């Protein structure tokens, strides 16, 4: 082979090798940048930091509120389990949609959770500290969120959970959709002068419950009704005695419809309240203004809390 031709072949081979090395180097840099972009760190409500190399793919939700938020944040393929309440139509707004996820967990059972090999566990701050710690002791990624007590808390919770699962933009979209829904509901209700706003008391099976920090207070404000229990000024939350409720003399009694144990039939609870001798002198009972609204809305601390505003306004002003 002539020397000149041999040199041309060598030069061509070296050029090809150089191109391959450049391409490989670019691919490596691209992969490193991609991995760097995918990695992120979040801090939960207790100040605990969680580091993720990539978005979690086996997420476990241990409460109905995070069940409802999570299903709108990520595809079902990234959810390993929901809470057991997700299948109860009395308290869950996503019963049918939740069927796309096969497993259910009890937030108190560390072993059952561990068996599902989760890469992220969402758990409320009211769970016992020892349960949370037992999960962390298993080297599991546990994100403890603050239980919402207002509409702003719900917005914040959605945003924080969005960050935790690596879907910050999706979380913002959910908050925007929630606020747009709330505006439509408020536009439907219209403006009701304060002096014409109905005074109500929300009753449980064991009586009225006083709580100065409860999401229901915000529901009332947006529905333009007055929660008569806010006129009380107790030192701590608790059951309000019958005499105090009678003194408040509400115009409406409100009940949450959820027969969670087969012994709390909503219609029967209405009748029991209307026939309770202790409340016969209240305007609510005298005028038979005892209404039941869906518990899955009025007890919600997810985006579905907006539905409670509409339910309450409809019950109080449309009946």
Where are the predicted features?
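Bacterial Sec-exported substrate-binding components of ABC uptake systems
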Residues: 2-11, 15, 24-67, 169-201, ...
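Short helix-initiation/N-cap motifs at beta->coil->alpha
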Residues: 45-47, 99-111, 233-242
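A short, structured surface patch at a secondary-structure boundary
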Residues: 61-116, 120-125, 228
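Extracytoplasmic substrate-binding proteins
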Residues: 39, 130-204, 208, 229-230, ...
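Proline-aspartate-enriched helix->loop->beta-strand connector
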Residues: 109-123, 140, 241-258
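Short secondary-structure boundary segments
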Residues: 63, 125-126, 147, 252, ...
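Alpha-helical, coiled-coil/dimerization segments enriched in small aliphatic residues
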Residues: 86-88, 209-237
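Extracytoplasmic/secreted envelope proteins and their assembly/folding machinery
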Residues: 53-56, 63, 67-68, 95, ...
């Amino acid at each position: 082979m002539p020397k000149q031709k041999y040199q041309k072949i060598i030069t061509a081979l070296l050029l090809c090798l150089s191109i391959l090395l450049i391409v490989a180097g670019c691919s490596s840099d691209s992969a490193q940048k991609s991995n760097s972009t995918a990695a992120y760190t979040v801090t939960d409500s207790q100040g605990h930091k969680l580091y993720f190399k990539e978005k979690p793919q086996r997420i476990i939700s241990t409460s109905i509120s995070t069940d409802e938020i999570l299903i709108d944040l990520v595809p079902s393929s990234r959810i390993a389990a929901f809470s057991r309440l997700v299948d109860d139509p009395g308290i869950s707004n996503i019963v049918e949609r939740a069927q796309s996820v096969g497993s259910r967990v009890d937030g108190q059972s560390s072993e059952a959770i561990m068996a599902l090999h989760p890469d992220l566990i969402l758990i409320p701050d009211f769970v016992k500290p020892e349960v949370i710690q037992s999960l962390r002791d298993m080297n599991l990624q546990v994100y403890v969120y603050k239980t919402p007590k207002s509409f702003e808390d719900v917005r914040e919770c959605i945003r924080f959970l969005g960050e935790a699962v690596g879907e910050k933009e999706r979380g913002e979209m959910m908050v925007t959709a929630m606020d747009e829904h709330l505006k439509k509901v408020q536009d439907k209700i219209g403006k009701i002068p304060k002096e014409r706003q109905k005074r109500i008391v929300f009753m449980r099976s064991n009586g009225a419950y006083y709580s100065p920090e409860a999401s229901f207070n915000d529901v009332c404000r947006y529905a333009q009704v007055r929660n008569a229990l806010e006129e009380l000024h107790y030192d701590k939350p608790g059951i309000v005695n019958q005499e105090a409720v009678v003194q408040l003399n509400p115009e409406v009694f409100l009940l949450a419809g959820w027969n969670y144990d087969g012994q709390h039939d909503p219609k029967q609870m209405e009748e029991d309240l209307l026939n309770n001798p202790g409340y016969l002198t209240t305007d609510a009972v005298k005028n038979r203004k005892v209404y039941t609204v869906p518990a899955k809305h009025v007890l919600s601390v997810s985006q579905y809390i907006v539905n409670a505003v509409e339910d309450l306004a409809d019950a109080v002003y449309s009946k």
